[in-house]
Every structure is written in structure tokens, then in C-alpha cells.
């Protein structure tokens, strides 16, 4: 392409397959990443060659609206951020499986704790994995507030069950998997914080002054949006890109749809969590 004096290259954003091509070409050409939704052809016989010809024609006529592709350092942050989201989902699945094993053993502690990720629940699980099954020993691991609220007899009864060697092994394995997932999550967050403190210290500090946003949310927002707001014309454009703005789909004075777009799923989750946290804060929001 350099031999033929090509200066601009456009490509479809197909899953992750565009990323290695983008990395190879970015030092040499002006690149455009096109959303396939906006460059669809009229239905006809389809092939890769015809698609390439169509994208080239759209590029020459300046019809390609390039997608937002963040700088390399932000892309690295995104990998850590999205890994944390994946690990959180994995932890939830493992906790559900762990509780299912305990329910199978007639251990009903989850009926009395706030959630299966609480310290008391984890302490009991660790004891089971070590072969400790006596209710009078397990009840000592329960937080006093839980015992005072429900009564020691009810808590002790919830810890009486029939636990086989196989189930102890399953509990031990699931606990090890949970510990590994938690350790990986901490490593990812530590790396994100290290990069943000080195590359974007001022932005990281300012974000945490907003009610509802702490360290984890601040690093996630930087990873998903970046720090160059010139990429978005207005705040409405950013809201739309995040998938938080209703679509404008109206024809002949009839509203067809007002549902939000898919947007950036990870960013939307973070912003919604921050909004819920801010709604519960005592700080005044201006």
C-alpha cells in the first residue's frame, strides 16, 4: 500500500479481528474504524472483495464515520478493566455453586447472612474446606450482630447438616477458585491504579471528587472513555456513545422507538453504579 501511495485506510470493526491489523497499520496510514451498521450495502451477492471495494468507495466519498479508537495506553487499561468485569461475573457464579453445595448438605446459613460474599459466610466455608463440620465450632465464626439478630439456636440449626468427603472436596476446590479470582482481580486493579497514577494523575484525582466515584470507578472511567474529551462533540454525544441516551426514531409524527442503544456496556455499568452510589451520599450534588 505504501508503494501505491495509499494514505488512508478504512476497515470494519469486526469483533477483535480488526485490532492486530490496526496495530500494524497505525504508524503508516490515517485509519478509520467503521461500524458495519453504517456501511451496509444493499442486499446482493456478498463477498470479502465486494465488501472491501464498497468500504474503499465510501472512504473516497468521505462517507465513513470513524469509530472512537483510544490510544494504546487506554487500550491497555481497558484490558485490565474488562478482565475485572469478567472476574466479578466468575466470582458470582462460583459463589452460587458454593451455596448450592452447602444447600445440598442442608447448610442454610445463606438464609441468615446479608449475602454469600460476607465475612461470616466465607469463614464458615473455609472451615468446611478444612474438614470442620461441628455446628458448635462453626457458630463461633459468625459475627455477633447476626447471632443477636436471629438467635444462636437458629444459626446453630442452620449449620447442622450431612457433609460427605466429596462435598468437602468440592467446597475446598470452589474456595480455591474464588481465592484465585479475587487475587487476579486485585492484581488487575493494582496495575490500573499504577498506570493511572503515572499517566493521568490529575484526571484520577479530579474524578474522585465527584460524589459516587471512588478509586475503582475512576480507573474504570478513564479506561473506557480516556482523558481526551475532544473525541466527543458534546456531553450528549458521550451519553449516546455510553448507551444512556434514548434513540430518536420518529416517522410521520409516530414514535417508533425510544429505547437506549447498546453503547459501551462496561462504561454503562460503571456509570449506573456511580449514580446509585451518588443517590445515597449525603454530599450535595450541584
Regions found by a protein language model. Give the residues of each.
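A detector of single, family-specific signature residues
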Residues: 1-286
Amino acid at each position: 500500500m505504501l508503494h501505491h501511495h495509499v494514505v488512508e485506510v478504512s476497515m470494519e470493526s469486526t469483533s477483535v479481528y480488526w485490532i492486530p491489523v490496526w496495530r500494524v497499520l497505525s504508524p503508516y496510514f490515517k485509519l478509520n474504524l467503521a461500524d458495519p451498521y453504517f456501511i451496509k450495502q444493499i442486499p446482493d451477492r456478498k463477498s470479502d472483495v465486494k465488501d472491501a471495494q464498497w468500504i474503499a468507495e465510501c472512504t473516497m466519498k468521505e462517507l465513513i464515520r470513524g469509530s472512537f479508537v483510544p490510544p494504546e495506553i487506554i487500550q491497555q487499561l481497558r484490558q485490565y478493566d474488562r478482565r475485572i468485569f469478567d472476574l466479578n461475573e466468575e466470582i458470582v457464579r462460583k459463589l452460587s455453586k458454593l451455596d448450592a453445595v452447602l444447600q445440598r448438605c442442608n447448610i442454610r446459613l445463606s438464609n441468615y447472612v446479608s449475602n454469600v460474599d460476607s465475612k461470616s459466610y466465607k469463614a464458615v466455608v473455609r472451615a468446611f474446606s478444612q474438614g470442620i463440620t461441628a455446628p458448635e465450632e462453626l457458630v463461633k465464626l459468625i459475627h455477633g450482630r447476626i447471632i443477636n439478630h436471629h438467635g444462636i439456636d437458629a444459626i446453630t440449626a442452620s449449620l447442622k447438616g450431612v457433609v460427605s468427603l466429596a462435598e468437602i472436596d468440592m467446597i475446598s476446590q470452589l474456595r480455591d477458585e474464588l481465592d484465585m479470582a479475587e487475587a487476579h482481580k486485585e492484581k488487575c486493579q493494582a496495575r490500573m491504579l499504577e498506570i493511572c497514577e503515572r499517566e493521568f494523575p490529575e484526571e484520577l484525582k479530579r474524578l474522585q471528587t465527584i460524589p459516587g466515584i471512588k478509586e475503582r470507578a475512576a480507573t474504570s472511567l478513564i479506561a473506557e472513555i480516556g482523558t481526551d474529551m475532544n473525541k466527543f462533540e458534546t456531553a450528549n454525544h458521550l451519553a449516546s456513545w455510553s448507551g444512556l441516551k434514548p434513540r430518536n426514531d420518529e416517522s410521520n409524527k409516530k414514535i417508533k422507538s425510544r429505547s437506549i442503544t447498546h453503547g459501551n456496556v462496561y462504561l454503562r455499568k460503571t456509570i449506573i453504579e456511580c449514580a446509585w452510589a451518588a443517590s445515597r451520599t449525603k454530599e450535595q450534588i450541584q
